[in-house]
Amino acid sequence: MAIRDKLAQLAARLHDAPQYNSQGAVLFVDLEHRATLKKYLPLEVMRNFLGGRGANMWLLYNLLDEERAALDPEVPLIFGTGILTSSMPSATRGNFTSMSPESDAILDANGGDYFPSFLRTHGYDHIVLYGQAPSWTLLKLAYENIEFVDAAPYVGMDNLALPKAIERDFQCVEREDMALARITTAGENQVLCAGIMGGIKAIWARGGGGAKMGSLKLKGIMVHGTPRELQPVEPMARYNKVIGKKIIGTSVIKNALKMVGTPFLYKPSRVLCALGTKNHQETSWKESLDADNFDPYRPGMDGCYLCPVHCRNQNDMTPDSQGGWGAAALKGLTGNASYDKAQASVEHGKQRNYNGILNDGKYDQYDKGDGPEYVTLGKFGPLIGIAEPEQVLRLNNILNDLGLDSASTGSSIAWAMELYQRGIITQKDTGGLDLSWGNYEAIEKLLFMTAKREGFGDTIADSARAVERGKYPAAALDYRMTVKGLFQSDPHDARILKAFALGLSVATRGMDHLRNRVTLEINARINDDPAFKTALYNGVVSAAPNSYEGKEYAVRKCENNYAVGDSVGMCRFNTKLFNSPTLPDTGDFAVQLSSLTGQAFVEAEMDEIGRNISGIEHMLNFRLGLRAKDDTLPRRWFEEALTEGPFAGEKIDRKEFEAMKARFYTVTGLNSEGLPATDWHEKLSRLITGFSLRVELPRPLPGAPEQIVVIDETVGDVTALRQALLRKLPEAAAELNDKSWNVAVNGAMVLSGELTARVSSGDRITLVPIIAGG
């Protein structure tokens, strides 16, 4: 069904006015016809899925035609702000959601800076984009005014140049009276690892959102005008102070994130020997990339809209800069190196020695910027064999300008480097590039080639799909570090960390730690009291990072917390369990949601809402063809043991892993194919589409281990039902096309007139084999 037809059906279920206090509108934007429609989501969507990520999934489920390619303009790109975005400390974020062109799963990228808060204060909670614009377009929003602006003058501009041009042409200043979500040349060229930029460093990175936005010929979304404050009611304002104190009073925030940012994570990972190195062939790297080695180049910190933390470390290697912000901030913090406490006091005394990247005294725009985050430090340090802080900083700044996801881009380059090392590809394939580990000159050049899809950059631009697109031989898949077709999001090697590994395997957007990372495993010796862990995770969880026992409870609890956090707009860094067990939790979110929306929430139901959000994501991925077999890990982690560190010899045991995964499915409420079990599935279907048919099968079929299929698309007769069954279970087509299987509706056999036999939501359908006899 065409998206405009799907939208017409959906619009009939939506409202013309807000359904609760502070609700913003959903703006549907038909880029092809330059038309818009403004509606409001039903109250039950907020009650069961919140906003942001959760409500995005509700919209995507109703509008997606999974039989189309991800870059088809009929597949929508959806942005959603959290319900508490701009109204609570550190709630600054929103999600871009679609079907991923980069992976086999959903696209769902979370980001902050100023765009989500500006959008929400201008009266919009969600934007649904579809159709390809007739020419490159800038969507300009200013409260009720919506304009489709010719973006031809901005085509070819990257992240540093574009906002300057917008500021000039519209006489505005980014982060003061303008916010801009935009793509770079990488997005224009549909580079699969291109993100959507929201600031000098802020990026909606994962899953290929930049390519998806480029497929719509949309250069950017501009929110123009000073944001109106969404004035919190008095109880909310008072409790915001409690939340702010929780955040700022937490040790990891106060001593690490506010002072040096996420690079503090490099040392504990290095000491544990859980640091992906040379495409995970090794697991430890140089001390030269410990966070204190960046001190001389750190002039200060920046942050998102009204956030009290300011965790974004800035960098400046130019001659007149003043570094030293946060110098020695981590010294003596034993929690930062719990497996080798002496390392906590090690300072390297790094001095400024940068004289331009060619050591010729020449500097350019890439010698200063924002970042790096730990992800970029790991992906463009140990993963590709780079050991110099200055080289990492410069690569970080180039990535930010080019709008490339550092996780996927770094992993794609590391994959290519290992293939080059093994002789699977040669300089004939790379266009003469020497892809030896640590070859900085080749790596910098390759980034620009990737954004333009030039030469071997065209291969890197295809990210994890390079084999599928004919760029590498099938043998290359043995060395691809992906789950569900998405490269790993962070630099950790999880062969030691069993909960971490489980989380990466079941994460709904692919191999991504931000869905459910059990961070306390990394520094397990800080919080290893069994009773504490049991209370924290609602189940008995082993304190040993390399144990499989109880880790399903830890992943389940983290997944619920983070899904709720995304859907209210809270930064992951400041959400309980990601960095600390003392940070704001779902109980705090419930208090503020109740105050802001006028709807009563309690902590217990927030946990269930988190489960609902992951449940709808599992349902979406099932529609995209993913099954339990896709909840797995790269071959290397099962077959190759660690060779160094306190856990040398560790790897993932397949039997133990599968048992742990099965337990996770059970505590989550999934069946053995990773799909919500029948009763929960029916409940979710009614909440999402307003339609649910339970079809009982004569026996278990591929994809239907419970002998039941839940149909959640509206069908009116038995023929339409049979077609829906085939769409739901294409792997069982032979059985479902068996004409000897009759249909019974509410116990009554349909013997003739099948084309006109009516079915309705809630009916009980049974497929009954004909019994032959004579």
Regions from the PLM with identified roles:
Residues A25, V75-L77, A179, G303, ...:
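A generic secondary-structure signal marking the coil-to-beta-strand transition
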Residues D30, T92-N95, F170, E176-L180, ...:
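Extended C-terminal regions of large enzymes
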Residues N48, K683-R686, R764:
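Short, surface-exposed, low-complexity cationic segments
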Residues A109, D113, S117, L160, ...:
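Short, well-ordered alpha-helical segments
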Residues P163, G209, A590, K661, ...:
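Generic structural marker for isolated residues within well-ordered, non-membrane alpha-helices
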Residues S215, G773-G774:
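A short acidic Gly-Thr/Ser loop motif
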Residues T689-G773:
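Ubiquitin-like/PB1-type beta-grasp interaction modules and other compact soluble beta-rich domains
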Residues M1-G300, D401:
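Basic, polar low-complexity surface loops/patches
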